[in-house]
Every structure is written in structure tokens, then in C-alpha cells.
A protein has these predicted regions:
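Charged alpha-helix within mobile-element recombinases
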Residues: 231, 237-325, 365
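Short alpha-helical "recognition helix" segments of helix-turn-helix
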Residues: 34-39, 98, 102
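C-terminal, beta-rich DNA-binding module of retroviral/retroelements integrases
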Residues: 294-391
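Mobile-element integrase/transposase regions
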Residues: 108-109, 120-179, 186-208, 240-244, ...
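Acidic/histidine-rich, metal-coordinating catalytic segments
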Residues: 201-230, 252-255
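Basic, flexible linker segments flanking DNA-binding modules
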Residues: 57-151, 156-157, 226-229, 233, ...
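Short, amphipathic alpha-helical "recognition" segments used to contact nucleic acids or chromatin
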Residues: 13-30, 79-90
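Short, Lys/Arg-enriched anionic-surface-contact patches
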Residues: 1-21, 68-77
């Protein structure tokens, strides 16, 4: 409300106007104690307000800092630079990620609320999407590092909106929330999952259990949405490999059941995509290198937590074991009279060795490694058999 004083027109807030009315009464017929009770102030504060109103008139009830620039306010140059940086270079970052980048790359320590206020005033910044939230119970984290890993694929336009959609296959520890290794592939395939596990086991060891969805490469699925174990179900190549390594498989029935892993995927989609864009990376191989060398270590430092039990649950694999011979799809073939086998719509000619000139009638094991190479082993000696594609 506007109040005229002398030749000046003052704009008072409602609480300031009420304070002025009471103080004016205190200057005539109202006691200081009564005014203090009405304004929820101490008598000493009322005496100070009476003195200010006598000296300044209605301006005496206005706070002294009103209209002043705060001492901690950022300069206009910083404000303009932050808004310009977001619009030109960081337009696909969320605000938290943008604040971190300002501090780390440009040494501009600006708070989240300040940046958010500046961007909203400039009609910029990310647009929030309202999500319908349902009540769910939080599951406690596992106690030990390596006790339980999430392995999941996240399809997204990771390499840019104009690039084909790719899938990030990511292994994440449940106890610490730290991502361990990831790889980009066209789809979430068996070989892609084996490749990620190979790097995890090489670097950390064998985990206690894997928490997975019911994708076809992990377990046998039925049509019509029924995921019921039946007697005629045969184990998948993935289940056979994990059984060999004594790694337990735990299957989730919905994305909500894998909430912690799904949130990690969401964090990667918000943060990794703009970082790959700024780095000029548009191909899967360099994106995988950047992911594991730069991005994952930073995410682990920023969001990882300490496990409740400091002793790790990872186990060392046997020293003599070549993991590639376990993390693969295995099948058997009968050798024909001309020392050939049929595999993947091709005829493979088995080549003789010094100690085994012929394998006619034998059953050999064919392994498809995750690097898409084919390896054939002798049925009795397990030695590798050389071969070539028969034309």
C-alpha cells in the first residue's frame, strides 16, 4: 500500500503498514508493553521503532536493507556469463550438473538456487517433467562391496539425437552405488553382457550375485508374459556361465523392483549425453573409452557411498581359468566324413594336426566368444582345433 509522507510516496508491505499503525498509537495513547504484545516484539524494539518513526516518519518502519544490493550478491558480469554459458554450451545439462561444471571448469562457485533463479528469469534452463509417483518401500543396500551387482542395458540416443539409438550395458554395485564398467552396443546382447562382466571380473573379481531383468539372453522366457520355470526349460548360455563361476542370479519382475539401477541409468542419461556432445564423441568405441576412463570414476567419487561392511565380497577366479572360455556361448557339433561342421549357416573345414589328422565322427565343442571370434576345441584333449570357412 502506498503512504504519502511529506512530498514522498512510500510503498509499504502489509506487515509494515500494520506496524506503522501500532507505533503511531504508541506515540499517543498506547503503552510500549501493549504495542510489543500486538506486534510480537520486545518493548526495547518498540522504543527503537518509536524513535525511528519520530525522526523519519513512515520510513522508520521499513527495514534498513530494503532496496540495497546484498553484500554477497554476484556481479552482473557473472550473472550474464552464467546465462550465456548455459544457452550456448551447456543447454542440455541439468542444473546440478551445470553448477558442478561451472565450479570445476570455470572456477565460478555459484549456488544451485542462484543459478536456477537466473535461468528461470532468463526463460532458460531445463524443463521439468511431472512424474506420477507411487508409494514404494526402499530396499536396504547390501552390506559388502561386490555382494550384489546390477547388470542392465539402457537404450537411448547416447551419441546424439541424430545418431542411431545405442544401448549402454552397465554393471553397478549395490552396496556402494558405484558403477564398475560399461560398454556401448547396438543392443543388449549376450556378448555385450559377457564383455562387461569380463572386465568387471578382471578388475574386481567374481561377484556374489547378479540382479537382472528377465531378458531372453539371461533366462528362458515364455510368450504371453508368463515367467514361470517349467521342467522343459533349458538353461541359457548366460545361466550356464554363471553356474560355472558360482555366481547367483536374481531376477526382477519389473523395472520398479530394480529402482536403484534404474536411477543410475537416469543419471547417466542426464549427465553422460551432454558430456559426450561437448567432447565431440559420436562413435561407440571412443564413447566406451570415455565412459570408463573419465565419466565412471567421476560418478563413483561424487555419488558413491561407503559399504556398511568394509570387507569386499568379490572372489578371485581360478588362476588357470581363461574367462573367455566360460563367458561365451557353447554348442556341440558332429564332424562329417569330410572333416567339416555346420555352424551359423556356414561350413567350417577342420584342419588336421600332427597328432590328430582326422576328427570324423567326433563331437567338437564350438565357442562363440564375446569378441565375435569362433573357437573349436578337441573333444578329449580340449586343445583348440584350427579351422577355415569352406567355400
Amino acid at each position: 500500500m502506498y503512504v504519502r509522507h511529506m512530498r514522498e510516496l512510500l510503498l509499504l508491505k502489509e506487515n509494515e503498514l500494520q506496524r506503522l499503525r501500532v507505533i503511531r498509537r504508541a506515540l499517543t495513547d498506547l503503552s510500549a508493553t501493549g504495542a510489543a504484545t500486538m506486534l510480537d516484539l520486545s518493548p526495547r524494539q518498540v522504543f527503537r521503532l518509536k524513535a525511528k518513526v519520530r525522526a523519519l516518519g513512515p520510513r522508520g518502519v521499513i527495514h534498513g536493507n530494503t532496496g540495497r544490493r546484498p553484500a554477497i550478491a554476484k556481479p552482473a558480469t557473472v550473472h550474464n556469463r552464467v546465462v550465456t554459458l548455459y544457452d550456448r554450451e551447456f543447454y542440455d545439462y541439468d542444473i546440478t550438473h551445470f553448477v558442478e561444471a561451472l565450479d570445476e571448469e570455470y572456477h565460478l562457485p555459484v549456488s544451485y538456487d542462484t543459478v536456477r533463479r537466473w535461468l528461470r528469469a532468463a526463460n532458460s534452463g531445463p524443463r521439468r517433467h511431472r512424474v506420477c509417483v507411487h508409494h514404494r518401500h526402499r530396499r536396504e543396500r547390501r552390506l559388502r562391496f561386490g555382494e550384489w551387482l546390477f547388470l542392465d542395458g539402457s537404450p537411448h540416443h547416447w551419441l546424439g539425437p541424430e545418431r542411431p539409438q545405442a544401448t549402454l550395458i552397465l554393471a553397478t554395485d549395490d552396496a556402494t552405488g558405484k558403477p564398475l564398467y560399461g560398454s556401448f552396443a547396438p543392443q543388449e546382447t549376450l556378448n555385450g553382457c559377457f564383455q562387461v562382466l569380463y572386465h568387471v571380473i578382471r578388475q574386481y573379481g567374481l561377484p556374489g550375485a547378479l540382479y537382472l531383468d528377465r531378458a531372453g539372453q539371461f533366462t528362458t522366457t515364455r510368450h504371453g508374459g508368463t515367467h514361470v520355470f517349467q521342467r522343459d526349460d533349458k538353461p541359457t548360455h548366460f545361466e550356464i556361465a554363471m553356474q560355472t563361476l558360482a555366481v547367483q542370479l536374481i531376477f526382477a519382475d519389473s523395472p520398479q523392483a530394480r529402482g536403484r539401477g534404474e536411477r543410475i541409468n537416469g543419471t547417466f542419461q542426464r549427465r553422460l549425453v551432454p558430456e559426450l556432445r561437448r567432447a565431440g564423441i559420436t562413435e561407440p568405441e571412443p564413447a566406451t573409452s570415455y565412459l570408463n576412463d573419465e565419466f565412471i570414476p567421476g560418478i563413483a567419487r561424487r555419488f558413491g557411498v561407503a559399504p556398511k561392511d568394509p570387507s569386499p565380497a568379490f572372489r578371485r577366479p581360478p588362476a588357470h581359468l581363461d574367462l573367455r572360455t566360460v563367458l561365451c556361448a557353447k554348442s556341440t557339433r558332429s564332424v562329417s566324413n569330410d572333416n567339416t561342421i555346420s555352424f551359423n549357416s556356414q561350413t567350417l573345414q577342420l584342419l588336421p594336426t600332427r597328432y590328430c589328422p582326422s576328427l570324423v565322427g567326433a563331437r567338437v565343442q564350438v565357442q562363440e566368444w564375446f569378441d565375435d571370434t569362433i573357437h573349436i576345441s578337441h573333444p578329449s584333449t580340449k586343445d583348440e582345433v584350427r579351422w577355415r570357412v569352406w567355400n
